[in-house]
Amino acid sequence: MTQNYRITLLPGDGIGPEIMAVAVDVLKVVGQQFDIQFDFQEALIGGAAIDATGEPLPSATLDTCRHSDAVLLAAIGGYKWDSLPPHQRPEGGLLGLRAGLELFANLRPAQILPQLIDASTLKREVVEGVDIMVVRELTGGIYFGKPRGIFTTETGEKRGVNTMVYTESEIDRIGRIAFETARKRRGKLCSVDKANVLDVSQLWRDRITNLSQEYPDVELSHLYVDNAAMQLVRAPKQFDTIVTGNLFGDILSDAAAMLTGSIGMLPSASLGASGPGVFEPVHGSAPDIAGQDKANPLAQVLSAAMMLRYALDQPQAADKIEQAVLQVLEQGDRTGDIISVGMNLLGCRGMGDSLIKALAKS
């Protein structure tokens, strides 16, 4: 029986349209193989939306996304819009999208692919086999807590204030996603906080610990954030799934990403309690190579695989895409950002063609 899904495509800016085209081609092939029918709808976001409508997230785009099963986003931003006021820049489109879809969980995988292990700046024996998922709370914590702002004291001195706030319900909902994610992986969850100093982290640790009683099959551990950062570099293979707050997750997810040596290979997902999630590569819009057929589409393709796995419950189709990525790398196909001696240099379209051939063979 054919499964039907409505997918909103947000190509965005820079290399976005190029890498999105590859991901769509891959999804169409996998759809045929697994009897999945995709109804793709394209909408504007970021700089492209500013140029066309004057705002980074048109209401029509948000409405289209809300009526989708999932949203596949490519890239946002570029030099062209850097002179705009901060609240009018392309990046505001992504923040508005997350808020409008009520997305509170950001999933950032960091996996060392054996074909690219030498791209890491760490020793082979340290990073070989690393496969980490960072689950970051996305809508609370110090980035959104109030009071906030820069104030003038009675003595005329400037005083900057930000407030780190989490409620029980906010902690519980991100905790459940983290436990469920760990359960689907290797059954280990590390909660990262600063409970030795911060009251808000003490509540975080208490709630995560209480929640663990509902997941006896998941092994829970706790680390302070400073130690977690050190352990990520010292012995990253000890980690399976990490859950943490907004600020700590912002930092640790980027640190984990660079264990792989190529941020151009990394996908991500932003999820809510219900409704569509947003799936996108970690990398930026790379306006310096836009339109030159030099972009690496693999992170976009892997984001499509995450969409299949986490939004559409199609793990076999996701596996098929991930295996195709490994196959093209194994046969030596590379884009310019991951090229090494003896490998085959391909452009964005060429890498897409190679993926389609790999999917057809498997």
Swiss-Prot record:
Signal peptide: none
Cofactor binding remark: Binds 1 Mg(2+) or Mn(2+) ion per subunit.
Binding sites annotated in the UniProt record for substrate: R98, R108, R136, D226
Location within or outside the cell: Cytoplasm
UniProt keyword terms in alphabetical order: Amino-acid biosynthesis, Branched-chain amino acid biosynthesis, Cytoplasm, Leucine biosynthesis, Magnesium, Manganese, Metal-binding, NAD, Oxidoreductase
Enzyme Commission no: 1.1.1.85
Protein function: Catalyzes the oxidation of 3-carboxy-2-hydroxy-4-methylpentanoate (3-isopropylmalate) to 3-carboxy-4-methyl-2-oxopentanoate. The product decarboxylates to 4-methyl-2 oxopentanoate.
Oligomer and partners: Homodimer.
Name by which UniProt lists this protein: 3-isopropylmalate dehydrogenase
Species for this entry: Nostoc sp. (strain PCC 7120 / SAG 25.82 / UTEX 2576)
